[in-house]
Amino acid sequence: IYCTPAHQYPLGVPMSLPRRMALLAEAERHGAWILEDDYDGEYQYDQRPLPALQGLDSQGRVIYVGTFSKVLFGSLRLAYLVLPRPLMEAFSRARAAFDGHSNQLQQAVTADFIRAGHFATHLRQSRLLYQSRRDLLLSELAEHCPELNPIHSGAGLQCAVLLPPGGEGRWTQAANALGLGLRPLGQFYLGEPRLEGWLLGFGCLDNQTLRQLCRRLGALMRTASDGLMDAADRDKP
């Protein structure tokens, strides 16, 4: 069972504690393994993070997956597993068979970075930085894009916003024509989309750029809405 309980992508909703306990019970009942991908688990803003499934697991059914690439830098390419003890030998053999040339220098430097307390300091600072950017994004959207309804997940480096029904296609096309590069939520559905909106990333944007983009988006949406209203008026008998 693969899951991202800390922060579901793309809507960002965390898995509730009752659902986590129910999932663990189902895994135990069926003898299944849970692969817990701690996606964006480091960036929780509005409340204390819930315990990981791995920390709640008393039966050894959870394989916990984490990475340093997102919280430090992408080219680090250093990840890790927290395994139930009975799986250690099998995973070690598989790891050696697939890739026996890990960068030992990167691992040693990262371990020293953690032991010295620098990693914890970096996480605190980056969490505050990204929370301030998230808060600014929500404030600017409320002012300039009142048509958008943000999903307040309280986590991650992106924010999903919902559009009025029927608006995703026309507004996305207009925004992309201006170079805004918005990702519609409809792209994430295997079947028929049930929600319309966008996924807005803010992790790499400074405050000035965030303000500028929100104002451009607001102006675009007002222009598109006015154009639709004019077209509707022309179609009236």
Model-inferred region functions:
Residues 2-237:
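PLP-dependent class I/II
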